[in-house]
From Swiss-Prot:
InterPro entries cross-referenced by the UniProt entry: Kinase-like_dom_sf, Prot_kinase_dom, Protein_kinase_ATP_BS, Ser/Thr_kinase_AS
Record bears the keyword Chaperone: no
Any GO molecular function: protein serine/threonine kinase activity
Protein's recorded name: Sperm motility kinase
Protein species of origin: Rattus norvegicus (Rat)
Region (Disordered) residue spans: 336-369, 563-616
Gene encoding the protein: Smok
Keyword Repeat: no
Entry-linked PANTHER family: MAP/MICROTUBULE AFFINITY-REGULATING KINASE, RIKEN CDNA 1810024B03 GENE
């Protein structure tokens, strides 16, 4: 018998009945109340979180029917919403709206007390909810922070109507109920009391507790708290605004006849300046005008429109009505989140007592930062050439950028170097700036490689540029003369190590330019050498002593002339020549017949040849050599080890 009774109890357990589990899934327990347990559940169709209040059927719960009837008649945005009622043999399940913000008591305990601005907003919503109840003759009789919930937006939801009752106008109540610290003084009289007045007193206690964090009437015993309530004495040692103290003093008036009504509270100075409008009731069109959109959604779920309209009209609070109310609540919350606030609602913020002018500061946003850094590298002659501008853009900083002095001589020239990957070296030659109005753009997508395919055709290019000139002066060049040595294959390869293809071609042209300059110099210089005084010995400080005969001169890449080449053109006289023992050097009219004569004998003075014939001869040589070099680039020949004639130089006579 006992075993059967245990099984029957398990089967009739609230969370084992099919009437509940067919529509909801139990998630957790929210707490235990004075009349039953509250569970957190999820609606299976809409996935809406709800609170289920489990009330067992017994003779002790005489107010159960009254609470359900009162909850059915309430429909206000600041009152917890009744969604579904499930009646079984053992229990009654009341499905309510779930307030995710929790209790107001928890919020006050977490912060100690609430700011006056927030107290104003929350208290206004409490007054609106209580005014709605009093207009319908409903007395709550248990207003306290534990029964005031907050939703996800922080708005008030008045709950727990277990002690509430419905009265008619002028009816007196005699039942002593409520929570002691929030009870009004007239509750302790047995002559009866006004239900609306005790709710206003409880509102005053809640407002005091929100603004100060302390209860106005405290004591260690029941009699001590009762005496303080009857006397109406409370502490005022808190920094509150005078208007707020005025509201508290009027609400906590001991005489209930002098206590204001709920509709008069909104006319106080602390509240009347606010223009907040209470949201419209969520159930304003529940009975006669259902939302067509929600009807279509429920039709997709399998509900018939006639069934939906009947459930809403008769207010059955069954599964059909619960689904409709949940879908409507979701639709209303989404619409309110999209709407922009009205300008009048901005008055809820804290009013500043000081000056309204604020210092404006400029906010630096991350999006305002440039994606590519721009560097401006000016040259020395930039102040003279206003039209010239040199700009470099990098996604990665370059290692080295070299600009030549002569590149800024031409007005209007613009040199732009763009990189996507950091280059290793960028150099510009002196001869780059000879042509006016020329614009050079060098672009690198990858760093220059150490090895280049140009190595394979170096011998052919060297032959085309250095040995293949059609000029007559090319036959006069002697490889044994160290001052006329342009470069060997080794120096040729060193010239190609750095720079781009354009710079490499410029290196060839520079070498040819130096060669013809030396030839023109020999044509326009004459030296008178007396017979018998020709000194065939080499001066002791000649170039051959400083540099061995077999050593070859290196050609600088990217432009600048080496100091050693400058010394070759104008070296100092020997000591014997300065003492008169050497030859007297003058201008000569012809080139020496023997190419083996040492050039140290003619290093006294140099005369610059005329420009017109010099340029004609240079460009003639450049044109022929450049065309032959371009033809040689079309084929890639294997590397051939060719000995340059300059390496077979004959040492000068001593």
């Amino acid at each position: 018998m006992k075993r059967w009774q245990v099984c029957q109890d398990l089967r009739s357990s609230p969370f084992q009945e099919d009437a509940l589990t067919d529509h909801y899934r139990i998630l957790a327990s929210l707490g235990q109340g004075g009349f039953g347990e509250v569970k957190l559940a999820s609606h299976l169709l809409t996935q809406t979180k709800v609170a289920i209040k489990v009330l067992p059927k017994s003779n002790k719960n005489l107010l159960l029917k009254s609470e359900i009837e009162i909850m059915k008649s309430l429909d206000h945005p600041h009152i917890i919403k009744l969604l579904h009622i499930i009646d079984t043999n053992e229990n009654i399940f009341i499905v309510l709206e779930h307030a995710v913000g929790g209790e107001l008591l928890t919020r006050i305990e977490d912060f100690g007390y609430l700011p006056e601005e927030e107290c104003n907003r929350l208290f206004r919503q409490m007054v609106l909810a209580l005014q709605y109840c009093h207009q319908r003759g409903i007395i709550h009789r248990d207003i306290k922070p534990e029964n005031i919930l907050l939703d996800h937006k922080g708005n008030v939801k008045l709950s727990d109507f277990g002690l509430s009752t419905k009265i008619v106008m002028g009816q007196k109540l005699t039942t002593l109920c409520g929570t002691l610290p929030y009870c009004a003084p007239e509750l302790f009289n047995l002559n009866g009391y006004d239900g609306q007045a005790i709710d206003v007193w409880s509102l005053g206690v809640v407002l005091y507790y929100m603004a100060t964090g302390c209860l106005p009437f405290q004591g260690f015993t029941y009699q001590a708290i009762k005496q303080k309530i009857l006397s109406g004495r409370y502490s005022v040692n808190f920094r509150l605004s005078p208007d707020l103290w005025d509201v508290i003093a009027k609400l906590l008036t001991v005489n209930p006849r002098e206590r204001p009504r709920v509709h008069e509270i909104l006319r106080f100075n602390w509240l009347k300046n606010e223009n907040e409008v209470s949201p419209s009731s969520l159930g304003g069109n529940t009975d006669s005008h259902p939302d067509p959109t929600i009807l279509v959604m429920m039709g997709d779920m399998g509900y018939e429109q006639g069934q939906i309209r009947e459930s809403l009209r008769e207010r059955k609070f069954d599964q059909v009505m619960a689904t409709y109310l949940m879908l409507r609540e979701k639709a209303c919350s989404e619409d309110k989140s999209i709407k922009t606030p009205h300008p009048t609602q901005c008055a809820q913020t804290l009013k500043s007592t000081g000056s309204t002018t604020e210092k404006q500061t400029t906010l630096r946003r991350g999006s305002s930062l440039p994606t590519l850094t721009t560097f401006y590298l000016p040259s020395k002659l930039e102040s003279l050439n206003k039209e010239k501008r040199t700009t470099m853009r990098h996604t990665m900083p370059p290692n080295l950028n070299c600009f030549n002095k002569s590149e800024s001589l031409n007005k209007g020239r613009r040199t732009i170097v763009s990189h996507t990957i950091s280059p290793t070296l960028n150099c510009f030659n002196k001869s780059e700036s000879l042509n006016k109005g020329k614009r050079t753009i060098v672009r690198h997508t990858m760093p220059p490689k150490k090895t280049s395919p140009v190595r394979r055709i170096c011998p052919r290019l060297h032959k085309s540029f250095g040995m293949g000139s059609a000029s007559e002066d090319s036959s006069k060049r002697n490889s044994s003369d160290p001052s006329l040595t342009i470069f060997s294959s080794q120096s040729f390869m060193s010239a190609f190590k750095y720079g781009s293809t354009y710079s490499k071609r410029k290196a060839f042209l520079q070498c040819i330019l130096h060669y013809h300059a030396s030839q023109e110099e020999d044509q326009y210089k004459t030296t008178i050498i007396p017979s018998g005084k020709l000194n065939t010995t080499v001066p002791p400080n000649s170039l051959q002593e400083d540099q061995p005969t077999g050593h070859l001169h290196n050609v600088l890449t990217a432009g600048a002339v080496d100091n050693r080449n400058l010394q070759e053109k104008s070296p100092p006289f020997s000591t014997t020549a300065t003492k008169g023992e050497g030859p007297a050097i003058k201008e000569r009219e012809s080139i020496p017949s023997s190419p083996r004569a040492p050039r140290e004998q003619f290093r006294g003075r140099s005369q610059t040849p005329p420009r017109a014939p010099f340029r004609r001869r240079v460009w003639k040589t450049l044109k022929s050599g450049f065309l032959k070099g371009l033809g040689s680039l079309c084929c890639c020949l294997p590397i051939q080890k060719k000995v340059h004639p300059a390496s077979n130089r004959v040492p000068p006579m001593k």
